[in-house]
From Swiss-Prot:
Residues engaged in binding Ca(2+) 1: D256, N258, D260, S262, E267
Function recorded in the entry: The production of the second messenger molecules diacylglycerol (DAG) and inositol 1,4,5-trisphosphate (IP3) is mediated by activated phosphatidylinositol-specific phospholipase C enzymes. This phospholipase activity is very sensitive to calcium. May be important for formation and maintenance of the neuronal network in the postnatal brain.
Region listing for Disordered, in residue ranges: 28-47, 551-570, 609-700, 986-1073, 1089-1238, 1273-1305, 1398-1469
EC number: 3.1.4.11
Ranges of biased composition (kind: Basic residues): 662-673
Cofactor: Ca(2+)
Residue spans of biased composition, Low complexity class: 1089-1107, 1421-1439
Entry comment describing in which tissues the protein is expressed: Specifically detected in the brain, with higher level in cerebral cortex, olfactory bulb and hippocampus (at protein level). Expressed in the pyramidal cells of the hippocampus, but also in eye and lung.
Name by which UniProt lists this protein: 1-phosphatidylinositol 4,5-bisphosphate phosphodiesterase eta-2
Subcellular location field: Cytoplasm; Cell membrane
SMART domains: C2, EFh, PH, PLCXc, PLCYc
Residues given in the record as Ca(2+) 2 binding sites: N416, E445, D447, E494
Naturally occurring in which organism (per UniProt): Mus musculus (Mouse)
Amino acid sequence: MGGLAWGPSRAAGSSWVNASGTWEQPLRGFSGLQGGRRRGRGEKGIPEEPLCQLTPQLGLSLRVPFGLGDYGLDMPGPQPSAASQTTGAVACLAEVLLWVGGSVVVSPRWQLSLVVERCMSAMQEGTQMVKLRGSSKGLVRFYYLDEHRSCLRWRPSRKNEKAKISIDSIQEVSEGRQSEIFQRYPDSSFDPNCCFSIYHGSHRESLDLVSPSSEEARTWVTGLRYLMAGISDEDSLARRQRTRDQWLKQTFDEADKNGDGSLSISEVLQLLHKLNVNLPRQRVKQMFREADTDDHQGTLGFEEFCAFYKMMSTRRDLYLLMLTYSNHKDHLDASDLQRFLEVEQKMNGVTLESCQNIIEQFEPCLENKSKGMLGIDGFTNYTRSPAGDIFNPEHNRVHQDMTQPLSHYFITSSHNTYLVGDQLMSQSRVDMYAWVLQAGCRCVEVDCWDGPDGEPIVHHGYTLTSKILFKDVIETINKYAFIKNEYPVILSIENHCSVVQQKKMAQYLTDILGDKLDLSSVSSEDATMLPSPQMLKGKILVKGKKLPANISEDAEEGEVSDEDSADEMEDDCKLLNGDASTNRKRVENIAKKKLDSLIKESKIRDCEDPNDFSVSTLSPSGKLGRKAEAKKGQSKVEEDVEAGEDSGVSRQNSRLFMSSFSKRKKKGSKIKKVASVEEGDETLDSPGSQSRGTARQKKTMKLSRALSDLVKYTKSVGTHDVEIEVVSSWQVSSFSETKAHQILQQKPTQYLRFNQHQLSRIYPSSYRVDSSNYNPQPFWNAGCQMVALNYQSEGRMLQLNRAKFSANGDCGYVLKPQCMCQGVFNPNSEDPLPGQLKKQLALRIISGQQLPKPRDSVLGDRGEIIDPFVEVEVIGLPVDCSKEQTRVVDDNGFNPMWEETLVFTVHMPEIALVRFLVWDHDPIGRDFIGQRTLAFSSIMPGYRHVYLEGMEEASIFVHVAVSDISGKVKQTLGLKGLFLRGTKPGSLDSHAAGQPLPRPSVSQRLLRRTASAPTKSQKPSRKGFPELALGTQDAGSEGAADDVAPSSPNPALEAPTQERSGSSSPRDTRLFPLQRPISPLCSLEPIAEEPALGPGLPLQAAAPTGPSQEGSQCPVGLGAKVTSSQQTSLGAFGTLQLRIGGGRENEEPPLRPHNGGISSGPREGTSGRQTDSKSRSRVPGHLPVVRRAKSEGQVLSELSPTPAVYSDATGTDRLWQRLEPGSHRDSVSSSSSMSSNDTVIDLSLPSLGLCRSRESIPGVSLGRLTSRPCLASAARPDLPPVTKSKSNPNLRVAGGLPTAPDELQPRPLAPRLTGHHPRPPWHHLTLVGLRDCPVSAKSKSLGDLTADDFAPSFQGSTSSLSCGLGSLGVAHQVLEPGIRRDALTEQLRWLTGFQQAGDITSPTSLGPAGDGSVGGPSFLRRSSSRSQSRVRAIASRARQAQERQQRLRGQDSRGPPEEERGTPEGACSVGHEGCVDVPMPAKGAPEQVCGAADGQLLLRL
């Protein structure tokens, strides 16, 4: 019998035989060849017999080198016929040479085209084969490889075009009768040589086929393995392009309903509906005519369809981004690309040569490529490539330190690895071990029990699961353990066998695993410490019980404690074999009905995965009662079954499945209890049972010496007190999820210290009979290494697990943070790591691409176009858990635009995960579309694509900015959170670390869905913008003693600040101090709204809607002076408030200055305009909102001579200058040059400004910064422009802008005001009154407070209060005479009572235009459904808060009281260290908005 084996090394010039019988260069990695007879040792190594001339009896066997496992591809020879002999020989040779661990590299001279083409041609022609199913009858189907060689298809099938298996999804192709399906058939049913199985998909489903002949079976196995090998060798860029090409072809074929090879206009329209494209029919027809180039025949061929798809999918967001960095050219040159990569993508060491290589690689246009230019197509290709993916490509390989002790790593672990389904009746399969090991799992579980014929078996004890041989399991583990990586595998043995079969187990382990068990070569410097993964490469560690040291070495066995036996079901859930086997069918039928009832009920709830079912933890509270009932005696099984149908089938009693199941078993069959006996209980029919009232008996078991000696570093021990310091690190403690959660809640710091020195394993509760998974994150927070999950249950928890371990090349080991390995902290604390810098993650969700319809859509592709929104969740420490979502975009799943920023604060980013979810909004809930979960440490900064997991083209485009922050962070929860401080939805506290919550009723869930889903036409409230608060700034801060600000000319304004300056009460919280001077406020405002740009459309500057005043309109200036004794220099620290300005829907919006000033002029031209989000998405000229976080400098008073100085948005030394309004600044970036103390987040495009030293800034000695003026037109001759530099790379040189001068010229912010009323002091400001709620608000159902529950009341025209969250000010209003309302209540009503016309996305935009007439066109009030009782509760709480404030401060209140819960989301605030003057505008004058720094009076609630 000839064979292929590894022989001695060959000389460099040696050769091998090729397919034609001549010798060529060998494959890399092979060191020798033995085939037929042993080859000669001549000069050219020519054998006596060519390898291709195989005898019919010849078989081949491949032994793979160490680290790749032993494939043992034993292939029997072909039949004697000459034709089949040649075909079989070629197939065998190709298989042997090509399938080496799924990857092969061939010499250029090696000619395999003939072999490959023969296999591919045969597969594409197709073969009729029998598909085996679980039933006894197979299905005859015709299987073939598609023309693109990307999918295996078959017919006939009811699935039509969905009847396919992608080559990418195939995990393994195995020959013979190896699958579980084949085992159900008698051995004589099929010829093993004609059988093979294809394992595919995330659940490792098997397709079991029987071919007509062994040659055809071998051809299919060879061809599929070849395709899989090519895919594994394919780089990520080529794979992405191939996937896209295949997707386009597949989409074209599916759209071609009549099969004529072209698409008509009707077929194109149907395809667009399927792709969730909502375009006007005329626009579609126009693009159709432009793409139809072959004499305009009215149809599109494939090439024409590709052109049509390209026109349709041109990315506007990428085009605007390209214009930004190309100086508004339609291409990027190498220098532009270099600047983009350095500034936005935060890449280091970018050279012009590397940029030129990118252009060569991604630019499809030959003309552009020859000129060294990257056009929009090339730029799109680059951003959609792996280089533009959000996942760090460095994390695709092992990059962490692997030399630390094992206890310093998280280790991915599997629970009941052998099961394919639930814990009661599912199948046990050997290939589950192959799947999880290849998926990166490093700890697998084997439940061993005594089997027939002296052979130990593996199955879930006391259940109806099927059984497999222990020997087969060990052989599979040996074969697949180190295919993906060589880091150690931990074999968790749950031993329930007798001593005799334990010896058999030890023999199999030793014989099969061999050297993999030999740990003598592993030496550790410290005997008390565990070895490292690097030292244990290629080793298998047996985790199990070990005989104590006091037992004689000659003893063959001994007794050990069985208390630590993990994963056993509760006593009342055990069904032993024996007499119960006669009633197996009856019990199985009952169990199936119960499980079906549970699964049907679980489908009702919101579910990210339709296959992700969950059965809540079943309370064992009735345990004693059930046991007592079981003692009443036995009765007939038939009677019990009939009596039990009524009690258990109903939905309300379905949760009692375990108890009723236990009851039936105990009554209807001989159920034995094992050794554990609870006090006062009696076992049934069990010899040696305890008498009533005896204490709990300690469980012991006998252990074989041979099996004990295989355990070294991973000795299983019983659970003990985590406060006791462990003596040895060579042991593993197992905790159920319930016990571990209890310890985590009671002793978190001790548990963390415990896990620093030894291993701990967490396993699911025994009540998770449906194999559902718990949340692993709380146990990772405590440093638990092996958090075992049910790999067969795909869903959220497994997605978190995959994301966790993808951060280190999927090797199964992830290094813990340093603080978890040394020292202790409380992971449940609100500030677990005080004094350490935190990370702030700013995610701007820009757009989506090719989002499909939900998988479980009733109408499928014919369903309505989706209304998507994005939800982002941060999962980590409890204090870090939060969840935010964007608004809903109506009727657009192809290219929706969100342009919204979500901000998260993370205390420990090393263990945090970030989860992106896309939902389809539905009137009664939401439908899951897709998700992508990543480790925080794996996220790349800059503009990135987030590809949804398991989807070919679906992605969302985001911008990522990560910055360091310090100080105490509190997430603002909005107006709702001000009064209802419940647990955050994303926090771990909300679900008790994975413990199921009581299930709400259907009506409650429907109400929750309706209330929680974001409104289609309104942006959801943002809760992610943090309020960063610190205590009082140290009086000795830098510069505090050098420069003193001049005293305020208004003593009345100084008093409040001086009074607060020494306060240290919890209410006197300050927004975090900056180490560099910035202006007091930082907010997000729309900067420019631009029309859609095409290649032929120049950028147009937006024009103001109102008349200008001397060429510009600017906000009224105020004298905002820093008078705090603690902060009196240039370093005086203002408050930072992040605020979202709602995007306007008007086509010609008023201009906004960069400093947040309000564009003035009458609003009659725009007040009546309103469009909802649906109509906006259909208007080609829709103007997207471009937001920037900017420092809004303090505005000078009219008498101040201080020159204007423009501060940088990032708090650095750069200066701001305003570009012309149409220029695009669409980015979120965090300056890498910021120091660790820079706590300002730059939510803008690359900063536009000149780098200037502080000394050169005019007016620095006065200790104040002023905001820059606004522009109504780009033609202001008095403004010095900014030149293009590295700090402002996106500046374009426009026609009217001269070169920037060397110095900035001082100029006033606004003309002097005349004719207005004197400014009242802060504590004498008149508060504005509102009418009582209308009748329509009194019949509202309970729910959250919205911005529409109150109607405004406008009276008077003299005095006004300017306060607001949006860009409009409040008109002149006074209280109704004779009505006195408390201040805080009125402010709350004012903040929640209005909506700005034309801005349907902002619920808190305040203030009418012009004369402020009641019910003017500038305001909208939408009807909603809320309860009047909530209004009264809010007002009562407001009054109580005010009374508390008055008691603390006395009756002389100087302003609205502060609510100790902090500022509501979206509200503005005034820093305690500064005061403002509020000028009163003249009657009849254009609206002027006054306030602190932003032209607004900012109220802190």
